[in-house]
Amino acid sequence: MNVTPTSAIIKEFAWAAEAIAEMQAATNLERYEKAWLDYLHYLDRGWNKLEKHLAGISQKNLSQARQTRKSDALLSYLMHARNVDEHTIRQVVVKRPGSLKITGGPGGGTIQRGVFSGDGQVSNIVYEGALDIEFVPERMEIMGVTDRGVFYDLPKSHLNVPLNSLIPHELARLALDHYNSSLNAC
């Protein structure tokens, strides 16, 4: 079988996409974290191969791709998170507990009684007024990382678009889409 430079890149990015699917299908946070770490690995390997491919095509495109990877908050963060996972014993994600948020609507509300379980189920609730009840399940979120003595905070944007999530698989999809479009532009 003849392996082309682009087929090697496509393979790594396909494995990164599989890791995203594994995160989304994970039945526990340990499996989710493993899929996240796999994703970081495959994304970085795909980038390394893309970088070598670009070097053989256009120095201008290579320079732009490297600059974007260094200056974009999300892409830079992912690079350093992978480095931290690969070369240290520090964590790159944090487990957040589930929570239940109850807010009163216009005019407020009063709960007289009810049962709120840890899985977000609400039963036998008696209340007056307007209430909004929101359950946020236990989840993994990215965390700031220190790579080679430099702290990299949580990314706030990707390609100048604000990020409104710290959920790994949501951020992973954005970065993978960017790298795939870079490959398609070759």
Identify the meaning behind each predicted range.
Residues 1-37, 58-186:
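Acidic, Ser/Thr/Gly/Pro-rich intrinsically disordered interaction regions
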Residues 53:
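Short, Lys/Arg-rich flexible segments
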